[in-house]
A protein has these predicted regions:
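Binding-site signature for planar aromatic cofactors or substrates
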Residues: 1-206
Length: 206
C-alpha cells in the first residue's frame, strides 16, 4: 500500500483513490498551487459579493447535513485572513447546523458565483458566538445587520483550508460547458491568487 505523501493535505479516501486512479501528481499540484490555509485578498473581495453560502456539518456520530444561508452581499464577512463570520437569523428552532457545530465544530463552506462562474471552498472550525459577545468584539459588524432584522447569534469560523471550485462545469447560457477540460483558462486559472500565496503545502520554495 502506498505511503501518505506528506506534507500535503488530503483524506485517506482521497489518497487511496488518487493512488488507485493514477492522479497523485495532478492532485499534489492542486494542493500546492490552489489550496492555502487562509483567505487571500481576492477571496475576501469575492466574499463581499456573495449572497448565498452552502454549509456542510456533521454530528458526533458522523451523520452529515447540508444547509444554506442567504443574505445581502457581504453577509459573510472576513474578519481577517484567518477568520470569517456570518449572522444566524431566526429559523425553525431545530438548530440542525448549529447543533452539529456545537458538538463537532468542523465545517465546510461553499460559495458559488454564477455571474462570474467560479466557486470557493472554505474549511475550518466553527464557534457559536452570542450577539452581545460579538457586539463587544466587533461593534461595527454586530451593530449593522445586513438582513432585515438583527441576527440572533453569529458563527465565527477559523479557516483551515480554502481553495477554488473551478468554472469548467459551471452552466452558461451563452456557450458550451467545458466538460472535463484541463485548459487552465477555461477552469478559471489562479482566480483567487493562491499560487503566489505562501502555503504550508508548497515545498518547492517558490
Amino acid at each position: 500500500m502506498a505511503q501518505p505523501r506528506s506534507p500535503f493535505p488530503g483524506t485517506p479516501g482521497e489518497r487511496y483513490l488518487q493512488d488507485l486512479y493514477g492522479t497523485s501528481e495532478r492532485a499534489d499540484t492542486f494542493y500546492r498551487q490552489q489550496m492555502v490555509d487562509r483567505l487571500t485578498p481576492r477571496m475576501v473581495e469575492f466574499l463581499a459579493r456573495q449572497t448565498m453560502m452552502v454549509v456542510a456539518s456533521v454530528d458526533p456520530e458522523g451523520a452529515p447535513d447540508v444547509s444554506v444561508r442567504f443574505g445581502e452581499a457581504g453577509f459573510v464577512t472576513a474578519l481577517d485572513e484567518q477568520t470569517l463570520a456570518w449572522p444566524e437569523m431566526r429559523g425553525n428552532g431545530v438548530f440542525t447546523t448549529l447543533g452539529n457545530l456545537a458538538k463537532t465544530p468542523s465545517a465546510h463552506l461553499m460559495f458559488l458565483d454564477y455571474e462570474h462562474r467560479i466557486g470557493l471552498h472554505v474549511r475550518g472550525d466553527a464557534e457559536i458566538v452570542e450577539t452581545d459577545a460579538m457586539r463587544a468584539a466587533h461593534p461595527e459588524l454586530a451593530a449593522a445587520p445586513r438582513t432585515g432584522r438583527a441576527p440572533e447569534r453569529w458563527v465565527v469560523l477559523r479557516v483551515r483550508t480554502s481553495y477554488i471550485h473551478c468554472r469548467k462545469h459551471f452552466p452558461t447560457p451563452d456557450g458550451p460547458v467545458d466538460w472535463g477540460t484541463d485548459d487552465v483558462a477555461a477552469k478559471g486559472g489562479d482566480y483567487f491568487g493562491a499560487k503566489n500565496t505562501p502555503s504550508p503545502w508548497d515545498t518547492t520554495g517558490g
